[in-house]
Design a protein with these regions (language model features):
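"…together with the soluble PPM/PP2C metallo-phosphatase catalytic core" -> "…together
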Residues: 10-229
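Pyridoxal 5′-phosphate
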Residues: 4-7
């Protein structure tokens, strides 16, 4: 399958070439903005003392600035803004519009992501109580699930069957999103580890969604790869 994808990528086809331009442009925007934002966020974090001190969970011997996620969020937001503007200008057919047609509200998804970032920044600055942080994550996850990003079911690994979750899609999705956010937070004991693992996961998602011709999801994946590098 991967060989087939690689081969078709080099055969001229207007639609295929257009989506690869999508990938390159959004990757460049996300990467460039994140790269430019890192020193700014770093300076602000150092100035206000928002740093990780050496401790039992950390291998660093000196303080490391927090809030790296803000720079990544800036890259993500910039790439999505460029995509949205170019879709409105009819520069290219819009995979985000496609997502809207399939019941996914991208604006709602971005609001949910923004809420998660806000909770993370506040926690970095003043260390939120676990209950308050957990509540903020749940609210953000509910917003994302309500925007149409749902785990509708899953395939049984050792058979051809599929379990359809039905109304359970909402609570299962919320639990998954909150759990995922906290898992990433827990492994963030080494500088760059969380971003590296997220980037590797995004690479896998990109390959899968390109295979399934899910251009909306593959664009999100390529932007994630760019901000994690």
């Amino acid at each position: 399958m991967l060989l087939h994808i690689s081969a078709t990528a080099f055969v001229y086809n207007p639609n295929i070439m257009l989506i690869w331009w999508h990938y390159l442009i959004l990757f460049a925007v996300a990467f460039g903005v994140t790269l430019a934002a890192v020193p700014v966020v770093r300076s602000v974090a150092i100035r206000y003392g928002v740093v990780d001190q050496p401790g039992a969970r950390r291998v660093n011997k000196e303080p490391i600035p927090r809030m790296g996620g803000v720079a990544m969020y800036a890259g993500l937001l910039a790439a999505f803004a460029v995509e949205y503007i170019l879709e409105l200008a009819h520069v290219w057919p819009g995979p985000f519009s496609l997502a809207q047609g399939s019941g996914v509200n991208m604006l709602g998804v971005m609001i949910g992501i923004t809420l998660i970032v806000i909770v993370g920044v506040i926690d970095d600055v003043q260390s939120l109580r676990p209950g308050v942080k957990f509540l903020g994550q749940i609210i953000a996850a509910i917003v994302i699930a309500s925007s149409g990003v749902l785990m509708s079911g899953f395939k049984i690994p050792l058979g051809d069957g599929r379990v359809v979750l039905g109304w359970l899609s909402y609570p299962v999705t919320v639990i998954y999103l909150v759990a995922f956010a906290n898992i990433i937070n827990l492994i963030d004991g080494l500088d760059g580890l969380a971003a590296g693992i997220t980037g590797i996961g995004a690479c896998g998602l990109f390959i899968l969604t390109v295979t399934l011709v899910r251009n909306d999801a593959s664009l999100v994946a390529i932007v994630l790869i760019a901000v994690c590098i």
